[in-house]
Amino acid sequence: VTCRVLTTVVSELTGTDGFGGHVGGDDFVFMSAPSAIDAICQTLIKRFDLVIPDFYDPEDRQAGFIDSVDRRGNHERFPIMSLSIAVVTNEHRDISHPGDVSKIASELKKVAKSRPGSVYVKDNRTNPPDSAPESTPR
């Protein structure tokens, strides 16, 4: 479902100028012109949040979570699935090494996952990737 929503939205908003795909596990990627990023992220979140509740029982949807067992066998409440989007862009700073893209994405993904619900976090820092952040990413 996630990949279908992603590829549909990217295609609708960028035509052949964008790309969306599955990296592995629960990780996906899309590439587009910076000018399309906000519209893509907002549309992805809107559509994902619209279809995902249909995969849950009515009681779980109402509660906002499911009761289940985690990987270690512990009883836990898991919230209804949401999207955490990390936006890495070269709009404000040069990214000269592919490894920096992964590093920045990882930093932003942690920030996104710390927030409730479906969100996107955009890297607006202007300093080089190897230096300390100037400000909190948004």
What is the predicted function of each stretch?
Residues G21-S35:
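Short beta-strand->loop micro-motif that forms the acidic, two-metal-ion catalytic signature
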Residues A36-C41, I95-H97:
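Short, conserved charged micro-motifs
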Residues I52, S106-K109, K113:
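Protein kinase-like catalytic domain
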Residues V1-T16, F48-V51:
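Active-site-proximal alpha-helical element of nucleotidyl cyclase-like catalytic domains
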Residues E91-H92, V111-R138:
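Flexible, glycine/charge-rich interdomain/linker segments that couple
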Residues S11, D49, P53-D60, G117:
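Two-component transmitter module helix at the DHp-CA junction of histidine kinases
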Residues F19-H22, Y56-S106, V119-R125:
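A short glycine-enriched loop-to-beta-strand structural element that forms part of the catalytic core
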Residues C41-F48:
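Short amphipathic alpha-helices in soluble, non-transmembrane regions
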